[in-house]
Amino acid sequence: MVVEETIKATSTEDLSNTIANQNPRGRGGDEDEELEEGEIVGDDDLDSSNLSAAIVHQPHPLEHSWTFWFDNPSAKSKQATWGASIRPIYTFSTVEEFWSVYNNIHHPSKLALRADLYCFKHKIEPKWEDPVCANGGKWTVNFSRGKSDNGWLYTLLAMIGEQFDCGDEICGAVVNVRSGQDKISIWTKNASNEAAQASIGKQWKEFLDYNDSIGFIFHEDAKKFDRHAKNKYSV
C-alpha cells in the first residue's frame, strides 16, 4: 500500500497540497510546451535510464502498477479497427515514477483534437473487449475545452492513491479531447453493481469538487447505441 503521507486526499484542497508537496516540478505548468502539438513525449524523455536518475533512493510503492496509453489522432484515420491505434506509453509502480512520467507528457490542454490519453491498471487494456472491462461501464465528467488539466490530475491522484472505497472496481480513466469540450471518464468492472458504481461516482465528484449531475453508461449499451446510449445511473 502506498505510504499514507505520499498520496492521501479526501478533498480538492488535500489534493492540491499533495501536488505541491510531491510534484518535483510543481504543478507542471508550461514546461511541456516544447513538445509538438499532439505529441505525448519525446523518444528520449521516457528512456528508462533517464527515469531511473529522477527516482529517489527510497521510492514510495503504489498498491497497483498503472500504465499510460495514448491514442494518437493522426493515426486513427489509418486504422480500420477501433482501438488499433492505442499504444502503451509507460508503466509505473511508485509515486516517483508517476511524477517522472506525468511531467514529461502533454496535459490535456496541450493535446491535439481527437487525442485520447488513458491511465489503466497494469495488464488491463483500455478497450471494451478486455475481459476485465467487458461487463463494465463508465462515469463521465465534461469540461470546457482546455479546462480539464486539474480534473485529470485529481482523478489520477485519487485512483493511484487508492482514495475510492470501491477502488477494486476501477479499471482506469481516460481523457478525451474533442472540439468544444474535454471528457474525463472512469471505467469500472461490474456495471450491474449499482451500489459500487454509485459510491465511485459520488466520491469522484467530491474529489473534483464537481457539483453537476454525472451519468454512468454500460459499455454494452455504448457498443449497441454509440452516442445514443442512455445513462443507467446518475449522481
Swiss-Prot record:
MRNA binds at residues 78-83, 110, 128-129, 178-183, 223-227. The keyword Disulfide bond applies. Residues 1-36 are annotated as: Disordered. GO terms for cellular component: cytoplasm; eukaryotic translation initiation factor 4F complex; nucleus. It is found in: Nucleus; Cytoplasm. Disulfide bonds join C133-C171. Residues 8-24 have a biased composition (Polar residues). It comes from the Eukaryota. The keyword RNA-binding applies. According to the redox status, the Cys-133-Cys-171 disulfide bridge may have a role in regulating protein function by affecting its ability to bind capped mRNA. One of its GO terms (molecular function) is translation initiation factor activity. One of its GO terms (biological process) is translational initiation. Keywords: Cytoplasm, Disulfide bond, Host-virus interaction, Initiation factor, Nucleus, Plant defense, Protein biosynthesis, RNA-binding, Translation regulation. Displayed sequence is cv. New Hampshire Midget and confers susceptibility to zucchini yellow mosaic virus (ZYMV). Component of the protein complex eIF4F, which is involved in the recognition of the mRNA cap, ATP-dependent unwinding of 5'-terminal secondary structure and recruitment of mRNA to the ribosome. Recognizes and binds the 7-methylguanosine-containing mRNA cap during an early step in the initiation of protein synthesis and facilitates ribosome binding by inducing the unwinding of the mRNAs secondary structures. Key component of recessive resistance to potyviruses. (Microbial infection) Susceptibility host factor required for viral infection by recruiting viral RNAs to the host ribosomal complex via an interaction with viral genome-linked protein (VPg). EIF4F is a multi-subunit complex, the composition of which varies with external and internal environmental conditions. It is composed of at least EIF4A, EIF4E and EIF4G. EIF4E is also known to interact with other partners. In higher plants two isoforms of EIF4F have been identified, named isoform EIF4F and isoform EIF(iso)4F. Isoform EIF4F has subunits p220 and p26, whereas isoform EIF(iso)4F has subunits p82 and p28. (Microbial infection) Interacts with potyvirus viral genome-linked protein (VPg); this interaction is possible in susceptible hosts but impaired in resistant plants. Belongs to the eukaryotic initiation factor 4E family. This is Eukaryotic translation initiation factor 4E-1. It comes from Citrullus lanatus. The gene is eIF4E.
